């Protein structure tokens, strides 16, 4: 049986075919031993510093906040090699794969960011890489598709279902169930069956650890709130982990509201879904009346996921974190505002978190508040999507 608790309150677990249990237990053993192995930790830390570029900056937004008493900082995961926070944990998982003697990596990707991160880690560490990607996402994210192929990854289009991230996840798990003796499944978010939610959190927690040290140095106190977008939830749990035991710091997760919650076209299962079992875990998810997984929707491919990581579900259920939603339109406005005010092009995913921070600022301009937004990735991959939308609106 497991050595670590596979549940967060009532959420989580290992709802997988029996054939995959040995692979998950082997992964848990490797993770536990690696966490207490100074050589593993030294190699991981060295890669994060000298290859990925950690620590990332904490940047104050002076222009965006003019006319208000809000002090707003961005944790700059967009500056990380690979363009997003995804690079952190794939380096950790790739080292674990080598520790277990695996020769191949299987991964799924939505926006393509986890695919790019997986491809670069495999190129660096000499692992074969095959990546499942929904056909619809391939259309939305052609630059990332080419990046993956440039770095030697095989990208397999998935045409089944909605041809998006959830379908790519299903295909990747199916592949792994037949190849786990030689392959490691490099799950891209803090979701799925145990031990993945725990592993991914621990391999992302430096985001919050660095933020805490940097904000104390720059402001002399902890923030009033840390804000992060939530799809599966890895960048958010990486930011939240070191602040969970700081009761004075509000944790705010921002789900994609899509065309508006009432439209049904969104990706906000935490607040507007029902608990079920999917992708190896028990967690809130978007379901039809008869319990089928419903298609999620977001302008940002990386948030277009019908469920959410189990630790977020737990933090929501006990009231420790507050989860809100932001529409496509609001995210787009925040995207444009950051470009024009600060000269930073954010990912559309991260723009959801920024939009909520700007909303907090606008609603209380006289309130002295210290906010940190996790800018989880850069927006290079999204410029064509945004270009098409702004062209259609006649804005450019």
From Swiss-Prot:
Pathway: Amino-acid biosynthesis; L-tryptophan biosynthesis; L-tryptophan from chorismate: step 5/5
Quaternary data: Tetramer of two alpha and two beta chains.
Lineage per the UniProt record: Bacteria, Pseudomonadati, Pseudomonadota, Gammaproteobacteria, Enterobacterales
NCBIfam families referenced in this protein's UniProt entry, alphabetically: trpB (TIGR00263)
Gene encoding the protein: trpB
Species of the source: Erwinia tasmaniensis (strain DSM 17950 / CFBP 7177 / CIP 109463 / NCPPB 4357 / Et1/99)
Positions where N6-(pyridoxal phosphate)lysine occurs in the chain: 86
PROSITE patterns for the chain: TRP_SYNTHASE_BETA
Protein name: Tryptophan synthase beta chain
CC cofactor: pyridoxal 5'-phosphate
Database matches in Pfam families: PALP
Entry function: The beta subunit is responsible for the synthesis of L-tryptophan from indole and L-serine.
EC number: 4.2.1.20
């Amino acid at each position: 049986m497991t050595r670590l608790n596979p549940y967060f309150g009532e959420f989580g677990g290992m709802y997988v075919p029996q054939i995959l249990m040995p692979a998950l237990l082997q992964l848990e053993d490797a993770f536990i031993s690696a966490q207490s192995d100074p050589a593993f930790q030294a190699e991981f830390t060295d890669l994060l510093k000298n290859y990925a570029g950690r620590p990332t900056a904490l940047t104050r937004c002076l222009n965006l906040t003019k006319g208000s008493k809000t002090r707003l900082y961005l944790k700059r995961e967009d500056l990380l090699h690979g363009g997003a926070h995804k690079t952190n944990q794939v380096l950790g998982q790739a080292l674990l794969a080598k520790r277990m003697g695996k020769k191949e990596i299987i991964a799924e990707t939505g926006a393509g960011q986890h695919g790019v991160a997986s491809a670069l880690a495999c190129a660096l560490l000499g692992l074969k890489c095959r990546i499942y990607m929904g056909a619809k996402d391939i259309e939305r994210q052609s630059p990332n598709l080419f990046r993956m192929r440039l770095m030697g990854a095989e990208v397999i289009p998935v045409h089944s279902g909605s041809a998006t991230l959830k379908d790519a996840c299903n295909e990747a798990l199916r592949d792994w169930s037949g190849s786990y003796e030689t392959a490691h499944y490099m799950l891209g978010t803090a979701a799925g069956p145990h031990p993945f939610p725990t592993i991914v959190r621990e391999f992302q927690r430096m985001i919050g650890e660095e933020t805490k040290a940097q904000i104390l140095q720059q402001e002399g106190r902890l923030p009033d709130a840390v804000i992060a977008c939530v799809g599966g939830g890895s960048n958010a749990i990486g930011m939240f982990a070191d602040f969970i035991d700081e009761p004075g710091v509000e944790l705010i997760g921002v789900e994609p509201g899509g065309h508006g919650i009432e439209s049904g076209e969104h990706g906000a299962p935490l607040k507007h879904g029902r608990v079920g079992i999917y992708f190896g875990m028990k967690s809130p998810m978007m379901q039809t009346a008869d319990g089928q997984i419903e298609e999620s929707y977001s302008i940002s491919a990386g948030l277009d996921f019908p469920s959410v990581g189990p630790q977020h579900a737990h933090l929501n259920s006990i009231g420790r974190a507050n989860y809100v939603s932001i529409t496509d339109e609001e995210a787009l406005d925040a995207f444009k505002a950051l470009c024009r005010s600060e000269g930073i092009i954010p990912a559309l995913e991260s723009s959801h978190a920024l939009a909520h921070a700007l909303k907090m600022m606008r609603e209380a301009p006289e309130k002295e508040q210290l906010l940190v937004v996790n800018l989880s990735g850069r927006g290079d991959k999204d410029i064509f999507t945004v270009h098409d939308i702004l062209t259609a609106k006649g804005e450019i």
